[in-house]
Each structure stands twice: as C-alpha cells, then as structure tokens.
C-alpha cells in the first residue's frame, strides 16, 4: 500500500530516550533476550521487554518513531544495534546532533532534549527534570518509570490521545 506524500509528511512523531527507557538493566526490568555471540560483546545494552514490538506497532499505526537521547552513541551504532531486533527508526537525535542543531552557539544553556525542535509530538523519557520542563518548552512527554508490564499499551494510548488532540486543532 502506497501512502500519499502529504500523509507521510503529516505523520505524528513519537520519540524515545535510550537509557533507562529502551535500554534497561536485567536486574531491575524484564528484558528482551540478549543478542547472540559475537554481537552481545559489541552491543552490551539490553532492551526493555517489548521494545521491538512497540516500535513496530507504532509504525504500523502510522506514527514516525524516533530516538532522542542525550547520549553520544553514534547514529550508526544505534541503527546497527536495533537492526538486530528488526527495528528501524525514522529519525535519530543523539547528544552530538542536539548540540550542533539545537544548542548551537546559544549563550543560554538549553535542556538536553527539545523534542518540538524536531516536530516530535510525544517524547518518552524517564528523567523527571525533562518531564517537568515539557510545559515550559512546549512539548508533550510521557514519563516512564519503573518496571511496568503495561508500558506498551499506555504509550500507544497516550500517543493516540495526542494525535486526536492534534487533529482537532
């Protein structure tokens, strides 16, 4: 099925932080099975259980899915790691890109993430400070906290509410 160009350009964007959101510790969270050797030596991060399903489902529902992280992992590293889980992001903003495109030469230190600068409608994060700044800087955020077996359903529902609200405007 081919989509019209205007439909693709108007797709709502959802972004995820990496650390403590998609990458979690198996000591505190349920995780996807580790990658097989030798990839488990290259990519030591463990994915929160359900991450590939959630990202692929969001894309099937018509959302663009991005990574927006303050980490300085390269875009290439992120792409290759997630390829092993059959996940392809629509966009990636890492710490390097954020500094170059958002912070630039601004004398005032801006927050580590400003999702609305990339037309991201919903950002998923664990950091309380980023969530508190959302109202001040005009972006929507869903704070993902501890282990939550229903996290996928909650994020899909939250994204649907925002998409509905945006279509009313």
Sequence positions of predicted segments:
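Alpha-helical substrate-recognition element adjacent to the catalytic core
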Residues: 1-101
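C-terminal cap/substrate-recognition subdomain and adjoining C-terminal extension
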Residues: 8-9, 61-63, 72-169
